[in-house]
Amino acid sequence: MAAKEGSRIFVGGLSPEVTDRDLERAFSRFGDILDCQIMLERDTGRSRGFGFITFADRRAMDESIREMHGRDFGDRVISVNRAEPKLGRDDGESHGSRGGRDSGYSIAGKGSFGGGGGGGGRVGEDECFKCGRVGHWARDCPSAGGGRGGPVGGFSSRASAYGGSDGRVDRYADRDRYVDRERYIDDRYDGAARYGARDRFDSREAYIPRDRYASDRYAAPADRFAGGDRYSRGSDRYPPGSYDKARSFERDIAPSAGSDRYGGGRAGGPIRGGGEEGRGFRSRAGAPYERPSRSGGGGAYPSSSTFDRY
């Protein structure tokens, strides 16, 4: 019996359409087969995607592993490994039943094998009990979706089916996904701390003075157009009293000969002091805008007697 148990192999990754006879026919060329079983689900009777073959001698077992591991069988890529009975079990428990809860075997060097009734067991620490590959659980096995699109869900080789030569990336895919999400969340809040409300106002203060509105709205009248206002070009753009100087300069200029509406005057520069001609038209006696006095004095308007007629 020990020789029989030492010649048993595990075949994983089988298509649901593969039967015991198909499996025995494929492996019979390596030697005499004593037993061939595909494990079934207890409730539904469906294939669980793996089985066991017992050869008559060890040489046939080694040759079958060397030739069939990672090869195409039907529309799947299968895995073939040596199976060993679990320790502490007698012969009856070790073999188990096709629809039993535990097959009673482990893959050599991979740890214990315990196929749950619903396919929730595992092979070793990180190996799928359905296909025998490492890197994913049985519930995530690519072979669970049936034979669509080629071997192992459409993958053509054992290495490419699991993202690399060792095939250990699928098991940690979910954990890495949450790690990346946590890293993103941390970076997002770190960014908020770096560019939050405080820095937003600080950056604005770098370009806009704090007293911008105070200087424009509440400055003293004499200092409103002095330096410091952002609309001024210099401190002398609007000097105090410039409007009065302009008006005084206008009064001092003598009217030109041809353009004076009110007569008098001669062309030339400003004439300061003395005489009616040197004075502005607003300061002359009898200016056109001078209000007539009721005393009957001279002026451009009629005397008060004229208004008395009405």
Curated annotation (Swiss-Prot):
Key words, A-Z: DNA-binding, Metal-binding, Nucleus, Phosphoprotein, RNA-binding, Stress response, Zinc, Zinc-finger
Keyword field contains Zinc: yes
Zinc fingers (CCHC-type) by residue: 128-143
Tissue: Expressed in roots, rosette and cauline leaves, stems, floral buds and flowers.
Localization, UniProt: Nucleus
Entries under SMART domains matching the protein: RRM, ZnF_C2HC
Keyword Metal-binding: yes
Protein name: Glycine-rich RNA-binding protein RZ1C
